[in-house]
């Protein structure tokens, strides 16, 4: 038996996909909180303590901290910084009015994004139709629920990852919501 595997880019004319990494730097105090937590697996924030019981929990909480907030054991959110939100604001402004799709991972990321920006979640078929018609300026999606099967390429060509996932599959599939057959513009 012979198996042939082909990528869509092998036989479809696709626009360019540009991956643009935007570094976000913490202040010295914020970096100290991050580093202390990474080393000690416990940190005191104001009146509450955040701890990680093992390396897997530590990894997830460090990812949360890098995004700007972290959950404690009671699922209460503790804000660390707004640096990613500031960078997100710059990127949205830099899109010069073009529609922007934002991928988030943690619920506290979504809450903070919704509090700061006028965004709409892509959750229903009406949301998808409105996005593809160009009626949504800034939309948010969660890779686990929007990573497969959605056709969002008609609504825009800019995807911003506010927080990354550990899943390469979800990352690639979410990117493929915009960079797919039918997209006319360079995907950023």
Task: Tell where the protein language model's regions lie, with residue ranges.
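Short, well-ordered alpha-helical scaffold segments within catalytic/effector domains
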Residues: 81-89, 107, 125-128, 172
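Generic structural signal for small/hydrophobic residues in well-ordered secondary structure
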Residues: 27, 61-62, 88, 92, ...
């Amino acid at each position: 038996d012979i198996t042939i595997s082909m990528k869509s880019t092998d036989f479809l004319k696709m626009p360019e996909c540009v991956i643009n990494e935007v570094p976000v730097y913490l202040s010295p105090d914020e970096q100290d909180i991050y580093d202390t937590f990474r080393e000690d697996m416990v940190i005191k924030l104001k009146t509450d303590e955040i701890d990680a019981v093992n390396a897997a929990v530590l990894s997830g909480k460090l990812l949360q901290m890098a995004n700007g907030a972290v959950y404690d054991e009671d699922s209460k959110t503790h804000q660390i910084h707004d640096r990613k939100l500031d960078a997100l604001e710059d990127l949205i402004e830099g899109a010069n009015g073009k529609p922007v799709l934002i991928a988030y991972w943690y619920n506290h990321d979504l809450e903070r994004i919704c509090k700061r920006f006028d965004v709409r979640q892509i959750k229903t078929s009406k949301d998808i139709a409105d996005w593809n018609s160009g009626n949504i300026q800034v939309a948010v999606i969660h890779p686990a629920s929007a990573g497969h099967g959605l056709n969002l390429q008609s609504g825009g060509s800019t995807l911003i990852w506010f927080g990354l996932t550990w899943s390469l599959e979800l990352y690639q599939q979410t990117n493929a919501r915009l960079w797919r057959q039918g997209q006319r513009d360079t995907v950023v």
